[in-house]
Amino acid sequence: MRALSCDFFETYIKDAKQTEIAPVPKYIKKRLYEHIEGILAGGAADDERVLEAIANHVITESYHHGNRTTKHNAIRNGLRYARVPSGKACAFCLMLASRGFVYHSKTSAGEDKGHYHNHCHCAVVAGNLKMKVSGYDPDGLNERMNELAASLGIDDWAAAAADKELTKVLNRELAERDRCWVLNGKVPFVEFENKLAKKNAHDHEIEQAKRLSRHGIKCVFQVDYERVDKKGTLIGKPDLSNGIELKSLTNTSNLERRIKKSLHNAKRKKGFKSCNFDATGTSFSNDEIYKAINSQAMKKRINRVSFIDRNGDYHVIKIRGATAPGQNPEVFAPH
């Protein structure tokens, strides 16, 4: 991977100076030795799983050093470089990627702290401020991550990504969003598992799913019931295959009662994970909706509920650990 990085650099960078492989940081060797020692302590050296784990670690470090080599040669040639995310990039990686081609010296290169983790597939690309990389839009990425953070009540997502605990919060929310939407802004299509699921889906539910999709939530309708015996006994399932139950707040005068009933019914469904309320057709304020959802979610011990407000904005209310009422759970409130 390191030699390939040099070859690639010389091929695609015009008038590039002679490239060289970047020095291996001392902490890399130490980290590898510690990893091997930890593996050997847990099993025999000839165990295939142990050898596979060691091989995977070596492959990962080789890939990462390819990135270090690209950075090293970019600086030697007076170029900038950017960190281009792919796959399941974490919030911290996305924060680095959203800066674009800003790194151009050993000082600025130190800003990313050499951050790499297991299964990180971010790629370092050398270039300049005007360079365009297919599928890489740092400004768009920053906008979407700002939107994602705002749905959690976080004002500055880049600062949050540098905070250990808030990074975990962002990463959990990233797991709920479609990766193509996160990385390149492509809105996922609303889909149906089969013809029956499409037939059973109500028009207002499909419209609600379309609104969710605009915020990067992948919506696939499933048949919302399951036969459990020969007598034809049915049990309910969530509207969407990812465990989301769709509920509307339209035409309700008693907000608390509607939410209470909706969460009660939703939680009983097999595979239920969260509930989304559509408030686009209501006159309730975000604060009123938040308070009602928070109150009922605590009582029902449901740790994730979301809603779409009158303006089409998406809000997530997370009650960490779904603690019992009166235990002051951590709540992320909408603005």
For each feature predicted by the language model, list its residue ranges.
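Domain-core detector
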Residues: M1-H117, G127-W181
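A short beta-turn/loop motif at secondary-structure boundaries
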Residues: V84-S86, R227-G232
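Structured loops at beta-to-helix junctions and adjacent beta-edge loops in soluble globular domains
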Residues: S86, L96, V125, K247, ...
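Structured core elements
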Residues: F92-L94, H121-A123, G243-E245
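C-terminal edge-of-domain segments
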Residues: H115-G127, H315, I319
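Metal-dependent nuclease catalytic core centered on acidic motifs
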Residues: D178-R227, L249-H335
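A short, glycine/Asx- and small/polar-enriched loop/turn
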Residues: T233-P238
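Conserved catalytic cores of phosphodiester-cleaving nucleases, focusing on short active-site segments
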Residues: L240-T250
